[in-house]
Amino acid sequence: MKKMMTFLKKAKVKAFTLVEMLVVLLIISVLFLLFVPNLTKQKEAVNDKGKAAVVKVVESQAELYSLEKNEDASLRKLQADGRITEEQAKAYKEYHDKNGGANRKVND
């Protein structure tokens, strides 16, 4: 019996308790909840800036088209002429739909 007690004392292993593990998981989950919404906001901001850049490209291509052809440019004409892609036209429409289209210079 004495040998068994000494063996158990020697075999005692240091480890984390369940409460400590739960506290760590709680802290990690709180940090996760704080950072994820910020990441989605940043992604939206980057997408908006990218679409704003596309708007400038489309408008400059429309101006060049108008100068060369002496007629008003439209998104369809610019696409048919190969000056912009379908994705650029879509981004142009989405940008103006989201921001109220008051300053829209190129029609469909």
Curated annotation (Swiss-Prot):
It is found in: Cell membrane; Cell surface; Fimbrium; Secreted. NCBIfam families: IV_pilin_GFxxxE, pilin_ComGC. Keywords: Cell membrane, Competence, Fimbrium, Membrane, Methylation, Secreted, Signal, Transmembrane, Transmembrane helix. This is Competence protein ComGC. Residues 14-39 are annotated as: May be involved in polymerization of ComGC. The transformation pili are flexible filaments, consisting mainly of the major pilin ComGC and smaller amounts of the minor pilins, including at least ComGD, ComGF and ComGG, and perhaps ComGE. Homodimer. Forms higher-order multimers. Interacts with ComGG; the interaction is probably direct. Major component of the type IV-like pilus (T4P) that plays a role in transformation. Transformation pili are dynamically extended and retracted, perhaps thereby promoting DNA uptake and transformation. Required for transformation. Required for DNA binding. Undergoes proteolytic cleavage. Residues 1-13 form the signal peptide.
